[in-house]
């Protein structure tokens, strides 16, 4: 076994993370392009696509978060040279992806239907429902794509997903233009056209990734047969993956509830709040991408029973993610005006956003911290802690505190949106502390098992 080198591990982690980060940026940018191009078409379509996206993401991540655990399984099994285990894991997650697609589609349809009862403008409602239905048509394919992406991630083969995601972004722009504005003899579809474009692209990249898997000779031994998965194995897969999906769902819904609760504070306040959240989501594509790579590295070292490398990669990954987050935070703080002006020229919105900027820097630092810790714990297959910690931090600490500070005078004068951001920051801080404590306990237990092997 080669001697562990901090510098070599850092280089490998960065090299491995880069394609994952690019993939995540490309997928995030697709949603941004949908919103921008719909906004240029009509204000109603902008509102509808924004609303539709806020419905889509929380429901989708419930399934997505469940199947990304395949990467940790494959990394561990590859390290143990367990080809049959890898084949079975791929079969289980593919089967699970298809099964989960059904409730995801039903939930999307149900929520879009429930919008009819909350007094939304009829025209906006029609576009929103059409956009969500279009996205729902691509759910099975995007789930299958993410299964194969996670599978390849576990094998540390990440470039093909990066190329496909980048290609999807490039294809998204002309297809959106054709379908939104009704070119090449097609009718104008507005925001609904953006949803149809996304569904088409999701189907296309899923087919491309399946073809890549089937054509690559090294992966022939991993091809699953067409028999049904073993019941006990499938249930185990579900119980490992589902808490991971619930953790992402809890976070997304938490942010949505904050946005809804803050809505009475006015349009400028909500605009500033959404700009801040958008900035944090862009930052997360970087730190979250590294965290996804860390999950694989940790799973691999556990499979090799290499306690020295396991300890080393945990320390390096946390230091790397927090260092990057700190640098980004400093840049955002000192160039806040420039960043915010990219989103708006409304002076009222800019002033409100500038008042939030320090809290945003703290938010993204603690968010990066919890991303790193969650990534490591996923590598340990401890997904329950990844779920329970944010459930406590966000819902039992962050949300109540934010509500009290923002909308009541129980502690101090009403702080408005800044009060909600104090709640966001404290919720993430508590989540990060809990995850750190859990990690230290899990790490000691894992090291003890590796030593006793």
UniProtKB/Swiss-Prot annotation:
<keyword id="KW-1133">Transmembrane helix</keyword>
<keyword id="KW-0812">Transmembrane</keyword>
<feature type="transmembrane region" description="Helical">
    <location>
        <begin position="318"/>
        <end position="340"/>
    </location>
</feature>
<feature type="transmembrane region" description="Helical">
    <location>
        <begin position="417"/>
        <end position="439"/>
    </location>
</feature>
<dbReference type="GO" id="GO:0042910">
    <property type="term" value="F:xenobiotic transmembrane transporter activity"/>
</dbReference>
<feature type="transmembrane region" description="Helical">
    <location>
        <begin position="385"/>
        <end position="407"/>
    </location>
</feature>
<feature type="transmembrane region" description="Helical">
    <location>
        <begin position="238"/>
        <end position="260"/>
    </location>
</feature>
<feature type="transmembrane region" description="Helical">
    <location>
        <begin position="93"/>
        <end position="115"/>
    </location>
</feature>
<keyword id="KW-0472">Membrane</keyword>
<keyword id="KW-0997">Cell inner membrane</keyword>
<dbReference type="GO" id="GO:0006811">
    <property type="term" value="P:monoatomic ion transport"/>
</dbReference>
<dbReference type="InterPro" id="IPR048279">
    <property type="entry name" value="MdtK-like"/>
</dbReference>
<feature type="transmembrane region" description="Helical">
    <location>
        <begin position="192"/>
        <end position="214"/>
    </location>
</feature>
<feature type="transmembrane region" description="Helical">
    <location>
        <begin position="160"/>
        <end position="182"/>
    </location>
</feature>
<feature type="transmembrane region" description="Helical">
    <location>
        <begin position="50"/>
        <end position="72"/>
    </location>
</feature>
<comment type="function">
    <text>Multidrug efflux pump.</text>
</comment>
<dbReference type="InterPro" id="IPR002528">
    <property type="entry name" value="MATE_fam"/>
</dbReference>
<feature type="transmembrane region" description="Helical">
    <location>
        <begin position="13"/>
        <end position="35"/>
    </location>
</feature>
<dbReference type="Pfam" id="PF01554">
    <property type="entry name" value="MatE"/>
</dbReference>
<keyword id="KW-0050">Antiport</keyword>
<keyword id="KW-0813">Transport</keyword>
<protein>
    <recommendedName>
        <fullName>Probable multidrug resistance protein NorM</fullName>
    </recommendedName>
</protein>
<comment type="similarity">
    <text>Belongs to the multi antimicrobial extrusion (MATE) (TC 2.A.66.1) family.</text>
</comment>
<dbReference type="GO" id="GO:0015297">
    <property type="term" value="F:antiporter activity"/>
</dbReference>
<keyword id="KW-1003">Cell membrane</keyword>
<feature type="transmembrane region" description="Helical">
    <location>
        <begin position="275"/>
        <end position="297"/>
    </location>
</feature>
<feature type="transmembrane region" description="Helical">
    <location>
        <begin position="125"/>
        <end position="147"/>
    </location>
</feature>
<feature type="transmembrane region" description="Helical">
    <location>
        <begin position="350"/>
        <end position="372"/>
    </location>
</feature>
<dbReference type="GO" id="GO:0005886">
    <property type="term" value="C:plasma membrane"/>
</dbReference>
<keyword id="KW-0406">Ion transport</keyword>
<dbReference type="InterPro" id="IPR050222">
    <property type="entry name" value="MATE_MdtK"/>
</dbReference>
